[in-house]
């Protein structure tokens, strides 16, 4: 990840990368530009490959649009790592904008960890279950 190794780049492109994060992990229903949790269906516990509903606003028949676990955990882990790295980039600054971005980065990390934890937890449980 470029942000981890080039902090100047990370600061210059924070808002641009934040747009990508908001596209898949936006927690705010007040955001007029991106849907809330584009792929994550918290009720069913799945991530959907093309979003929660079809272009016509209908659910996908037979749930045939479920995201593969490997794709979703990689996307959500990337969100968590980005938040962690950017919190490091902005930590220690006395600048108001940097403090604001530090708090945003912490929330990004929290969102990514929450999103990542949902599909990975059952995987770890099944893997450790040796009865069968």
Model-based region annotation:
Residues 11, 59-69, 110:
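Short, solvent-exposed segments of well-ordered alpha helices
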Residues 16, 71, 111:
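Soluble or luminal CAZymes and related metallo-dependent hydrolases
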Residues 13-57, 94-97, 114-131:
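Long, well-ordered core segments of solenoidal/helical folds
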Residues 16, 60, 74:
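Short, glycine/acidic-rich beta->alpha junctions
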Residues 52-53, 58, 65, 76-80:
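Hydrophobic transmembrane alpha-helix bundles
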Residues 63, 74, 80, 84-85, ...:
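Active-site capping/gating regions of soluble enzymes
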Residues 1-8, 63, 71-89, 96-104:
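Well-ordered alpha-helical scaffold segments within catalytic/enzyme domains
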Residues 1, 33-40, 45, 63-67, ...:
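Core of folded catalytic or high-affinity ligand/protein-binding domains
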């Amino acid at each position: 990840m470029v942000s981890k190794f080039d902090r100047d780049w990370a600061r210059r492109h924070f808002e641009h990368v934040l747009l990508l994060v908001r596209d898949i992990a936006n927690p705010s229903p007040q955001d007029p530009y991106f849907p809330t949790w584009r792929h994550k269906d918290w009720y069913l516990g799945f991530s959907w490959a093309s979003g929660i509903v079809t272009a016509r606003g209908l659910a996908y028949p037979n749930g045939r649009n479920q995201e593969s676990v490997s794709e979703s955990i990689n996307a959500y882990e990337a969100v968590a790592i980005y938040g962690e790295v950017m919190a490091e980039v902005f930590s220690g600054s006395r600048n108001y904008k940097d403090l604001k971005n530090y708090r945003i980065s912490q929330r990004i990390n929290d969102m990514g960890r929450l999103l990542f934890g949902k599909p990975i937890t059952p995987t770890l449980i099944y893997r450790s279950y040796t009865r069968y």
